[in-house]
Each structure stands twice: as structure tokens, then as C-alpha cells.
């Protein structure tokens, strides 16, 4: 099981995956917004999304788990 974590303090702007989706290494899974900049969050390995831990509008801190992959 792998996790995708936030690299910065931000707000979740858009979630691009849902539970059960298959993602490949490098796919963008969500977009964060910080200081009016859009920050793409990419999968660092391939897998199936088992849980999306956040929803649009949520505030996240550096290191928060955003998505879990199987």
C-alpha cells in the first residue's frame, strides 16, 4: 500500500480520481492551491485508488495523506 502526501500547506482545489480508479506513475491525482498558484499532485507509482482522504475545499498541511493506493 502506498500513500500520496501533500508537499506543502494548501487548499484542495480539485480531486481528479475516485476510489477504484487505476492510476499510473506520473498521473495527476489532484490539484492543490496555495498563494493563488495551482500545484498538481502526481502519483509516484502505479496502483488502484483505495481511499481519497480529502475533498475540495479542505485545508492540508505538509505531509498530510491525500490518497492511498493499493
Where are the regions a protein language model picked out?
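Short beta-strand-turn/beta-hairpin segments enriched in glycine/proline and small hydrophobics
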Residues: 1-11, 28-44, 69
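Short histidine-centered loop motifs in beta-beta connectors
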Residues: 8, 12-18, 22, 51-54
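Short, well-structured beta-strand-loop connectors
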Residues: 18-29, 56-65
Amino acid at each position: 500500500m502506498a500513500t500520496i502526501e501533500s508537499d506543502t500547506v494548501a487548499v484542495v482545489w480539485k480531486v481528479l480520481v475516485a476510489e477504484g480508479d487505476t492510476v499510473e506513475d506520473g498521473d495527476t491525482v489532484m490539484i492543490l492551491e496555495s498563494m493563488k498558484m495551482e500545484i498538481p499532485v502526481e502519483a509516484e507509482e502505479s496502483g488502484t485508488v483505495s481511499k481519497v482522504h480529502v475533498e475540495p475545499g479542505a485545508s492540508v498541511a505538509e505531509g498530510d495523506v491525500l490518497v492511498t493506493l493499493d
